[in-house]
């Protein structure tokens, strides 16, 4: 969750400093945790350093079960209409803003009016079990280039999906964005996406 929050906060700060209001930023980050036999602490796996590292990771996970953790953070700027009205009286270049993100952040402007920044952070966990992969299957997949930018060195939504024996938990967590979790977070903030049920011709 900390990594997803830092990603969201970086973008939020940049947009707020540029004068944007009434917006939301979504950040996510995924890591894989694998418990080796005889080890007390799990190995935390991010993206592979290179093809050789991807081969090492997939060989380690082959035929085994690991856990996928995806942290999601939403930071939403909720402007105060009265604040906007008072601030608009002054020239834009005279209005400087300062953003300080805390648990429930308060964004203080020079107009002495506060705007709220709603923050939600969640972590979704899914267990994934691989089939036993042969060295050739691992090499062929790594040579495709697909695993080189993915946590755990695989993309379940692509060709590698054929090597997944079982999933226990949210499929979207493994992809890197647990949609059901995100939807609940947006509802808590008061952001309700529209058009989900519109028929596509």
Enumerate the predicted regions with their spans:
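Anionic-ligand binding patches
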Residues: 1-201
